[in-house]
Amino acid sequence: IELAKKLDAEIISADAFQVYKYMNIGTAKVREDETENIKHHMIDVYDVDSNIDVKKYQEDARKILNSLLLKNKNIIICGGTGLYIKALLYDYKFQEETLNNKYDNMSLEELQKLLPKDSLVDKNNKRRVVRFLEKLDNGIKSEKSNKLYDFYMIGLTKDREEIYNKINLRVDEM
């Protein structure tokens, strides 16, 4: 919020749970009294029983992002879900799921043999291996090479104990 004030920026949340109304415990949503008149987007947008996925987030958050850019506003994208951030900022395309995926009945070991030797995919995560192989099949380049916006990415970390202390404090305040 301090940075947003200094930059005259608005904030877009990229957290997969802050987008839901009434999910206040464990999500570290900014409270209205904490915003200091800084506009926050993509918080409390959907009902908890809505079926929201990263594609829907991408569509809705990009509308906000593009609208703010047209107004020449500075923007801070803040939050916890790397996939949501990538989907928002990169040319991240979603394929329609196929009912008869040729990789469905293959074991992880069989799939690993199909990977190029220099691939950086997590070879122990079957879902990621399958997704990588599907991209190879369809000639899809890595999203990271296709930035849609000019941006700086800053990652912040905290000591694990400090994180847990803050979580406990928030729970106690509720």
Regions found by a protein language model. Give the residues of each.
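Phosphate/pyrophosphate-binding catalytic cores of soluble transferases and nucleic-acid-acting enzymes
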Residues: 1-174
